[in-house]
Amino acid sequence: MTEQFVATFKRSEAPSSRGKYLSRVFGIFSEEIVRIWAADPRAPFEDLGRPTLRMDGEDGYSTLDFTLRSRESGQVYPAELKCEIEYQGYRYFVLTGTKQLDHHSKPAFAALLDAALKRPGLRAFVNKNEIAVDGAILIWGAATNEGREVVVDAKGFSAVLTIADMIADLQACQSAPFRMLINERRTWSNELCDALLGPG
């Protein structure tokens, strides 16, 4: 699925504006794809909601994208989606190594790294209820096997998931909620274009 997913956006014969446009459109609803995947009972994780992380003794806090709980073990992981597709010439599209993480300097990503390393004093909350966490999960656009392994080893993530694999799972099981989401977004896009073109 990785090659197919990449080719959806990155085509050598197409103008660069195509990739920019598709990347922005996809970014509008990419988080919804993760939620639909996690809501499917066949997925290895379920989503408990957006987690808030903060360190004891510090005033600031960070809210991340997901709280993934393993359906097998019950372990809980804050998770963040980083799906930068066309940005800087697709430099961060496919995860191949740790250097691609270095430009993420915002507090939320730092909190994710703290959770991955199980930093003492880190507290997590979902819907204002404190929860125990067992690490952290990174969700990328696509990744090589080596890229996953290197990042897990270097940063301590419990797993590196990709939205490309999630889409493949949803396609394989013909997920009705996923198909509804995509068809709805396609309808909205067509309605906009039709309106801009005007009558006949």
Residue ranges of each PLM-predicted region?
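Polybasic (Lys/Arg-rich)
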Residues: 155-199
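Catalytic cores of nucleic-acid endonucleases
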Residues: 81-168
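Active-site metal-binding core of divalent-cation-utilizing nuclease and nuclease-like domains
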Residues: 48-74
